[in-house]
Amino acid sequence: MKIYSIAILRNSGNKALELCSAKDLSQFGFFERNGVSQFMTFFGETVAGRTGAGQRQSIEEGNYVGHVYSRSEGLCGVLITDKEYPVRPAYTLLNKVLDEYLVAHPPAEWRDIAQTSDQLKLRELEMYLAKYQDPSQADSIMRVQQELDETKIVLHKTIESVLQRGEKLDNLVDKSESLSASSRMFYKQAKKTNSCCLIM
C-alpha cells in the first residue's frame, strides 16, 4: 500500500489550481520523476475541475487510484495511491488535510489568486504523506481491526503451542470435567463428520 501524492487545489473559478502538494516519487527512476510529478499535478487539476462541490470520487488509472474530495468552500483534495490502499482511510486523510488547510488558510487568502505561492503551503503535508503510508494511522476502525487480528494470531499460536507439547485435543476433551456428556458427544460427532471429507 502506497500513497504517491497528496494535493490541495482550488477548484472554484475557470480552472483548478494546485495550491500545495507533497509527493513521494522514490519508487520511480531519477529521470522519470519530473514527468511523473507533472502528470500528477495535471491529473489533480483535471479531476478537481470536474468534481462538483461536496462530491467524492475514486478514479482508477492503470495501477493507480486518484481519490478526490471536493468541498463546498471551493477547495479540493486529491490523493493518488496504488490500488491496494483502502478507500475509507484515503477519504479520512483527505478530510483531515482539507480541514487543517482551511484553518491555516481561510478562503480569502486563495480564492482569487492567479498562481500559488509558498505562503499557501501546508507544512504538515510532507509529514502526513510519510505517516499515512500505513492506512491504519488514518482510520481508527482499521487500527482496531488490526489489533484484533494480532490478538487472534496470538490466540492461535497459544492453542497450537499447547497441542505441540504432545497433548491431543481428543485427550483434553475426554479428561475435561467442565464439558457435559452431550458436549463431548457433539465434539466427537463433529470430528467424524469433518474427517469424512478429508482426502487421504
Curated annotation (Swiss-Prot):
It comes from the Eukaryota. A lipid is attached at C196 (S-palmitoyl cysteine). Its main location: membrane. One of its GO terms (molecular function) is palmitoyltransferase activity. Residues 140-200 form the v-SNARE coiled-coil homology domain. Residues 198-200 form a propeptide. This is Synaptobrevin homolog YKT6. It comes from Eremothecium gossypii (strain ATCC 10895 / CBS 109.51 / FGSC 9923 / NRRL Y-1056).
